[in-house]
Amino acid sequence: MRLNLVIVFLLLVCCVFTCLSAFAQLPPPKKDPLIPTQATQGSTGCSTTEASSCAQAAAKILPIVMGASPLEENLRRLTDEVGGRVTGTPEMAKAVEWGVGAFRAAGVDVHAERYTLPVTWSEGDTRLEMLGPVKFPVRLKAEGWSPATPAGGIEANVVDVGFGNEDDFAKAGGVVKGAILLVHSDIGSTWADLFNEYLRPPMIIDRAVREGAAAILWMGARERLLLYRHTNSLAGEIDKIPQAMAAREDAMRLARTIAAYPGKVRVRFHMPNKIGGPIEQENVVGEIRGYEKPDEIVILGAHLDSWELGTGALDNGCNAALVIEAARAIKATGLLPRRTIRFVLFSGEEQGTVGSFEYVKAHRTELDKIRAMITFDAGIGRVTGYSLGGRRDIAAGVREVLKPLESWGANNHTYDASFGTDNFDFLLEGVPTLVANQEEANYLPNYHAASDTMDKVDIRELKLHTALAALTAWGIADRAEPLGKRLTRAELEVLVKETGLGQQLKVLGYWNAWQSGKRGRKP
């Protein structure tokens, strides 16, 4: 069914606005939060009926985290020695070993939990050969979960379809059939631009398949020939059509050549991606058991996997190391929380949050007792607060927990609900979720790129985030009352509608799974 252009445009605007709110630029960065004071000792604690356990915990956690620690060495070993780690590869297996070993060294109980990854994917030798009338090199990388080209590659004309909207396809006409399509992009510089890189492709891919195109070349949104990789199939499945990301300057040169020689630019496209599976994969799970309500759980998580062009330092090695360091710090205080704190390193996030989806399925009987799921997944930009997944009912509790760090400027929360990281399936199951809202810092230029390496990580900033994460998990776990309840399906239906999450689910292809109960709390 052909979508009206106006509806498509409005849908994208709604989705981008919803996603942008998750990373809204709140107050400008504060002065150094550790000067002149480390924590507000006189703060109200985790409950109005008890002493300031959060302030006491903060006073113990801060010197442990900010002092000498294994954080930097743990991150170095993960990024420099293990390197990029695509789920389903030997490097991912090494990353799991790294996580288990680091938790054990921190004195935290740990185990790995298996699940079945239906499909594995890795890139082969991706090449684009210009056959004429002009020849020049085009640097490109396969898009994640793209199918391989046939043996011998695809030989076809390249057709410029602009930004890939309905009008662009209509102007191109019948020449789209059997062609390789070049799709333009604007330069990306904001969180909204990044989310748009995920929101645009599904409809463009559907148009390309419907019109019989052979493959798609996406123009990179970053300058200076920087190569990076996204996935346009967000459900852990091989995509519908071969796709690659071309370096921006090369793609623009290709567009100019097509304009100069209409209908004559011909190429041979080789992309022998390796597709396998199913295969057993693992999430890494550490735990500090609660002393009073051990069956109630607060999860602090981050994804361990990455793409392999760089070494996955900003996305998301630094936050995998953060989770382990937060566990070490809490353990080292000698304090026990009322509830169990579970520390989870998820795999399969880059393939469409597969690992966290499988975790939720495996722990479905526990979901009523999971009091919060906290996750970090945006590099080392200063944390301004949390995205609370549409849950205004938990805001006061979160502010109370973070009151000991009032001067840090990290208690400004948003109420958006969006797809994008491992909170997703917990949110759809009605569990309270907290996703760290962070300033952009150097995340966007290096996201999924060859430049995502450890030298981009500000270790001191990472330590501050670790202290914040540890106190958040501790405070929620040690509250006298739960932070918030698990929402019913009816309540989730309202949340999905009011936050605009439903629009995202439709654009990204999750709507039917949500409606049927395959994804999220069952009707």
Features from the language model and the residues they span:
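Second-shell loop/turn segments in exported
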Residues: A58-M66, D80-P90, D160, S189-L199, ...
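Metal-dependent peptidase/peptidase-like ectodomains
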Residues: M66, P137, A251, K293, ...
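Short helix-loop-beta-strand segments that form the rim/entrance of peptidase-like active sites
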Residues: E73, E81, A329-V354
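N-terminal capping segment at the start of a domain
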Residues: T48-T89, Y115, D125, L227-N232, ...
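Extracellular/luminal Protease-associated
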Residues: T89, V138-P242, T311, N412
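His/Asp/Glu-rich mid-to-C-terminal helical/loop segments that flank catalytic regions of hydrolases
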Residues: R328, L444-G509, A513-P523
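Soluble metallo-hydrolase cores and metallopeptidase-like ectodomains found primarily
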Residues: A55-A57, R139-G173, S233-A313, E325-R328, ...
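Noncatalytic luminal/extracellular "stalk/propeptide" segments of secretory-pathway proteins
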Residues: P29-E50, C54, R76, D80-I180, ...
